[in-house]
């Protein structure tokens, strides 16, 4: 059983802290050993038991066996590679495509330095960084959606 510290309400320091709403450290149950030795292992073992139980009751299906001689008509990367895949697919020159791919992380590295003299954290008070972020997000979404379309409709997204 843990040792609890009983608050002395006649103490002027405690009364001042309670008046400010800072007296929560003077009463209650200590974290050691009650929480760390008894409650946390129960929560961790319960989480592991739930995961194992779900894995046993609902195993993931493997799907159909792989056929190395049957390739899909159009091979697409994972969804988070769609914008880069679209850049490589639409740019005719390989060197220019690689340079554009390198410009993505280098452009992201320059965003914090656009308004580093600005002391505000509110995005509405940092218009240049916010505009660069919004334009980058729109371009990434445009490239990502375009990568899922055929090559003749990919740049206009089939709208024009």
Curated annotation (Swiss-Prot):
GO terms for biological process: photosynthetic electron transport chain. The keyword Transmembrane applies. It comes from the Eukaryota. InterPro entries: Cyt_b/b6_C, Cyt_b/b6_C_sf, Cyt_b6/f_cplx_suIV, Cytochrome_b_C_euk/bac. GO terms for molecular function: electron transporter, transferring electrons within cytochrome b6/f complex of photosystem II activity; electron transporter, transferring electrons within the cyclic electron transport pathway of photosynthesis activity; oxidoreductase activity. SUPFAM superfamilies: a domain/subunit of cytochrome bc1 complex (Ubiquinol-cytochrome c reductase). It is found in: Plastid, Chloroplast thylakoid membrane. The chain crosses the membrane at residues 36-56, 95-115, 131-151. One of its GO terms (cellular component) is chloroplast thylakoid membrane. It is a multi-pass membrane protein. Pfam families: Cytochrom_B_C. The 4 large subunits of the cytochrome b6-f complex are cytochrome b6, subunit IV (17 kDa polypeptide, petD), cytochrome f and the Rieske protein, while the 4 small subunits are petG, petL, petM and petN. The complex functions as a dimer. Belongs to the cytochrome b family. PetD subfamily. Component of the cytochrome b6-f complex, which mediates electron transfer between photosystem II (PSII) and photosystem I (PSI), cyclic electron flow around PSI, and state transitions. This is Cytochrome b6-f complex subunit 4. The gene is petD.
